[in-house]
Every structure is written in C-alpha cells, then in structure tokens.
C-alpha cells in the first residue's frame, strides 16, 4: 500500500507536474472529442495528424459544423429536410441552416450568384437550373471520357492543347482531364457525373428562394425533381457523395498542392454528411419525398426556354435525362417537337 506514495515522493517535481498535466488533460481531450463527434465531426484521423494537417482539419471542423434550427434526429421525419438534403453539402460551406429554406448572409449569396453563375434575376436562375438538370457539366465530361477511348482523337487533341496549355487555363485543364481519363485515376471512368450537377442545382434553389427569385412552392417542387434524379442515378447517400466529390475533383483540375487541400476539405465535409453522426446518415435514403409537378418546366415553357434532346442525344441519355425530356416534351410547342399533354 506504500509503494505508490513512495514512488510519488521520490518523483522529481518536473516529472510530477507532467504527470498531473496528463491526468488532468486526458479527460478534457476525451470530452472535447465526444462533443465534436456529437455534432457530426470527427477528430483528425491519425494519418492527417501524422501529415501535419491536424490544425487544418480542426479549422475545417469549425467551418463545416452544421447550423440546425431543429434537431439532427428530426431530420429523419421532416419532409422539408428530406427535400433540402441535396443542398446540405453547400449549406455546410456557406454557413446556411441545413434544415430551412434560408441563407445566413443574403448579400454574399447575391454576390456569389452574380459572380459564379451570372444570375441576377429570376429568369437567369431558372435557365441555370434547367441547364443543370438537363445536361450540366456531365454532358461535356461524358463526351471527353468517351473520346478518350479513341487513340486517334487523343493524339490529335493533345497535340492541339499542348500548343497553348501553358498560356490558356482552359487548355491546361482539358489536358489534365484527358490524362485523368486515360489513366482512369480514382476510377473516374466508372463515375456517374450527375450528382455534381444535381447538388449544385439544389444549392442554387436555396439561394434563389432566399433572394426571392423563385417562390417557396417552386423551390420545394424543384427540390423534389432533384431528389428524384438522385434516386434514379444512385443507390445510397454514400454513392451520391462519392460521385459528387470525384466529379468536383475532375472539374477543379488542380495541381498537386491544391488537389491535396481540396481532398482534405471534402474528406472533412464528407464526415458531416455520411459519417456516423452525419446529416445524410440521419435521413434514410429510401425515405419517400413528394412527387414533383415540374413547375420549373411550366414556367420556362411560357418563356420559350425549353429544348428537347436530339435522337442521338436520346440514345446517349441516362434514364433520368430521358424522363426529364419526356416531361419537357409534354410542355414544349409542337414547332420544336413537343406534343400535347395526354390525360
């Protein structure tokens, strides 16, 4: 019984102080980690700490901590939260309440729409949404991926872009993407790019509704379209997230340093979405969502803004794109190939 007191009495004061600090600090660390996890975050993984990126991870935890007006548990039964789910990735980055059709900073949201999307009014927003739902970036990425299976095209195209890649950003990025497809980096040749377009469309809907460019009714209805598109394209939140982050990587087309920074960002963001306490984890993938009336198409029909897939486009289209085109045809004028709605 006297062993411990004897050891303590013989312990040098600096060592004793260090032991006390450890004994006091460990519970604090455990409590801090528990609180962090309860918010959907995860303490920096071992490999991140070893790489000297622990501080960056901690900053990302603060950046991505979700703003909830309700509880995380309520997400599973909240119809509106289910509709808003595709907008969560950008809500985390923008500091918006994930479970409400609102933004935290209207002025910066307005600036973002104008700067990044050239959207300053209702019609411009509707046209951007229509483009994302009908074809988006996935059309060009899919075309490039297909062409990369043709050695002759690859040789000629690389010869052209190599001439200007050092001076033109677009050419440099195209060359970068061609090599990614040729090497099948990150399994990019098997990725369905749709999530990249659908999730960005959900972000635009939140922003547009908050700024009054579209009505709440139009916003909820178009979010229902996006949820349906995701369900037709993927089998789980995990699969949708992987498709989004990989297509975002392809779109960004950055050098190694920036690529590593983006990877860390999305790894952290993914913890808040599909981690053990993630927002998407709280919402069952197969939870039913309201059926859309495709109000977006009704509005654009009055503006002459509808376009139909060509026969060749139809052949290459996904199941979702064909359904969207069918809905478009029932509203488009006969002069461009539309047909009257059949009841």
What do the predicted segments below correspond to?
Residues 1-11:
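Short, strongly hydrophobic alpha-helical membrane anchors
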Residues 14-203, 207-209, 213-216, 225-343:
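Polar/charged low-complexity regulatory segments
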């Amino acid at each position: 019984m006297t062993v411990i007191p004897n050891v303590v009495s013989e312990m040098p004061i600096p060592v004793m102080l260090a032991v006390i600090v450890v004994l006091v600090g460990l519970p604090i660390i455990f409590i801090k980690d528990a609180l962090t996890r309860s918010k959907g975050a995860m303490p920096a993984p071992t490999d991140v700490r070893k790489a000297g990126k622990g501080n960056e991870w901690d900053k990302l935890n603060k950046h991505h901590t979700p703003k909830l007006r309700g509880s995380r548990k309520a997400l599973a039964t909240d119809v509106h939260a289910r509709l808003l789910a595709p907008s969560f990735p950008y809500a985390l980055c923008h500091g918006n309440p994930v479970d409400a059709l609102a933004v935290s900073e209207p002025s910066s949201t307005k600036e973002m729409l104008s700067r990044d999307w050239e959207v300053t009014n209702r019609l411009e927003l509707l046209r951007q949404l229509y483009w994302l739902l009908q074809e988006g970036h996935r059309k060009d990425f899919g075309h490039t991926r297909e062409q990369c299976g043709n050695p002759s095209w690859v040789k000629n195209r690389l010869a052209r872009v190599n001439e200007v890649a050092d001076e033109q950003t677009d050419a440099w990025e195209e060359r970068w993407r061609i090599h990614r497809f040729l090497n099948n980096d990150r399994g990019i040749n098997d990725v369905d790019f749709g999530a990249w377009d659908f999730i960005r469309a959900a972000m635009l809907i939140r922003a547009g509704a908050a700024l009054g460019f579209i009505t709440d009714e139009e916003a909820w209805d178009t979010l229902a379209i996006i949820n349906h598109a995701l369900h037709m394209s993927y089998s789980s939140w995990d699969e949708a997230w992987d498709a989004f982050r990989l297509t975002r990587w392809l779109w960004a087309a950055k050098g190694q340093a920036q690529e590593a920074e983006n990877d860390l960002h999305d790894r952290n963001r993914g913890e808040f979405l599909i981690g053990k306490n993630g927002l998407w984890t709280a919402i069952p993938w197969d939870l039913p969502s309201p059926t859309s009336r495709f109000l977006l198409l009704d509005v654009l029909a009055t503006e002459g803004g509808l376009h139909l897939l060509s026969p060749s486009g139809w052949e290459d289209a996904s199941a979702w794109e064909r359904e969207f085109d069918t809905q478009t045809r029932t509203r488009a004028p006969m002069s461009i190939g539309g047909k009257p709605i059949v009841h």
